[in-house]
UniProtKB/Swiss-Prot annotation:
<dbReference type="GO" id="GO:0042797">
    <property type="term" value="P:tRNA transcription by RNA polymerase III"/>
</dbReference>
<dbReference type="GO" id="GO:0000428">
    <property type="term" value="C:DNA-directed RNA polymerase complex"/>
</dbReference>
<comment type="function">
    <text>Component of the DNA-directed RNA polymerase (RNAP) that catalyzes the transcription in the cytoplasm of viral DNA into RNA using the four ribonucleoside triphosphates as substrates.</text>
</comment>
<keyword id="KW-1195">Viral transcription</keyword>
<dbReference type="GO" id="GO:0003677">
    <property type="term" value="F:DNA binding"/>
</dbReference>
<dbReference type="InterPro" id="IPR014381">
    <property type="entry name" value="Arch_Rpo5/euc_Rpb5"/>
</dbReference>
<dbReference type="GO" id="GO:0006362">
    <property type="term" value="P:transcription elongation by RNA polymerase I"/>
</dbReference>
<comment type="subunit">
    <text>Part of the viral DNA-directed RNA polymerase that consists of 8 polII-like subunits (RPB1, RPB2, RPB3, RPB5, RPB6, RPB7, RPB9, RPB10), a capping enzyme and a termination factor.</text>
</comment>
<protein>
    <recommendedName>
        <fullName>DNA-directed RNA polymerase RPB5 homolog</fullName>
    </recommendedName>
</protein>
<dbReference type="InterPro" id="IPR000783">
    <property type="entry name" value="RNA_pol_subH/Rpb5_C"/>
</dbReference>
<dbReference type="GO" id="GO:0003899">
    <property type="term" value="F:DNA-directed RNA polymerase activity"/>
</dbReference>
<dbReference type="GO" id="GO:0006366">
    <property type="term" value="P:transcription by RNA polymerase II"/>
</dbReference>
<dbReference type="InterPro" id="IPR035913">
    <property type="entry name" value="RPB5-like_sf"/>
</dbReference>
<dbReference type="GO" id="GO:0019083">
    <property type="term" value="P:viral transcription"/>
</dbReference>
<keyword id="KW-0240">DNA-directed RNA polymerase</keyword>
<dbReference type="GO" id="GO:0030430">
    <property type="term" value="C:host cell cytoplasm"/>
</dbReference>
<keyword id="KW-0946">Virion</keyword>
């Protein structure tokens, strides 16, 4: 069931982020076959800035999520492809996020590739279309100029704002990064919507 949802919503995620697929969408049965046979399924897409984003969906029992060496080789080979990578998104079963050997590889690769965003997330962030969940208020990234205008008007510094983690589901779907600002519209008793600004901080993983 998780794989079916992942297959559906990962493409909606790519569309929501306004990315363009660099390969044709494969049928679901081929997606499953690749996850089972190779241990992962990869999607390449291009951002509005013409950067490349590679999304890896790893099988729960494949070698890449159990052996740090295999994960290191995969990521190193990927980043050596000489493409203009902007981001790698690794999607794994939640228990993998507690495996030190895998997390150490992520830290290592981030240090070796400081200009590339490398993130690892659990399946459940992509088993639903987060922006369409009615219980979640609308989130929107704002520019640094818009944020500075707000801060100046309110006589605030970024550290004075409430914070939101880069791993928060709506922020993940938006592609927000530490140092960015997000505008959140919440229902209000005195107005149709109350608008708040949050400062995005680094996630724990």
């Amino acid at each position: 069931m998780a794989m079916q949802k992942l297959f559906t919503y990962i493409y909606e995620f790519i569309e929501y982020r306004k990315m363009v697929l660099l390969e044709e969408k494969v049928p679901y049965d081929k997606f499953v076959q690749m996850v089972l046979n190779t241990g992962f399924f990869r999607i390449n897409a291009e951002t509005l800035n013409h950067g490349i984003v590679s999304v890896f969906i790893f099988g729960a029992n494949g070698k890449y999520v159990h052996h740090g060496g295999d994960m290191r080789t995969l990521l190193t080979n990927t980043l050596n492809e000489k493409k203009h990578y902007e981001e790698l998104i690794l999607i794994v079963d939640k228990p993998v996020l507690s495996k030190k050997n895998i997390l150490d590889i992520i830290v290592e690769q981030r240090a070796a590739n400081p200009t590339i965003v490398i993130n690892i997330y659990p399946y459940h962030l992509f088993c639903i279309n987060i922006p369409k969940v009615s219980a979640i208020p609308k989130h929107k990234l704002i520019t640094q100029e818009e944020a500075q205008e707000f801060l100046g008007r309110e006589y605030l510094q970024p550290q004075d704002l409430m914070q939101i983690s880069a791993s928060d589901p709506p922020v993940v779907w938006l592609g927000g990064r530490p140092g960015d600002f997000v505008q959140i519209e919440r229902p209000s008793e005195t107005a149709m919507h109350a608008v708040v600004i949050r400062f995005i901080t680094k996630s724990k993983i």
